[in-house]
Amino acid sequence: MNPNPNPNPIRLHVISASVRPTSAARPLAHWAAAQARARFEVTPVDLAEIALPFLDEPEYASTGIYAHAHTRAWSALVDSADAFLFVLPMYNGGFTAPFKNAIDFLYREWQGKPAGLLSYSAGGSGGAPAGRMLRPVLESVGMVPTEASAAVPGITGLVTADGFRAPEGLAAELAAVLDELAALARTPVSA
């Protein structure tokens, strides 16, 4: 049951943008979803469980004509969201190929929807370069990225068998992203 008392809650999909079996995205996304539940109707989405193949649709995504059941299911899931929080690892300075592939499968479903970024890395950047690289991609499919973002440097020391241990200040960073997502999701999109 969603603890959000709002009769029309914002439907936030928290997407783990990694398919690695040992990815830190899962425990980090679980933590982020827990932080968001007070204000949003949260749906966790794990790209590894979605298991999209490399883009195999014969038509361009902008047509909305989908030949494959996996694309239609992905379309319905993305379309059901009002906003997104992408939990984004950084690999070699960029974001993951499976995540780009998942974006490329669709077009209309992303239009006008706000997107927040929670990036992470093993190093000191917290994945911020991957987030900067992702922003123009999100804008190209008509999404509205938040100005605020949250970043987690040194992720390997923060994930244990018990889950993710948030460093000091991260909850406040994420709260700023969630505040902006809520404001953007409640703002009508102009044509």
Task: Locate predicted features.
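A short small-residue
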Residues: P9-H13, P114, P153-D162
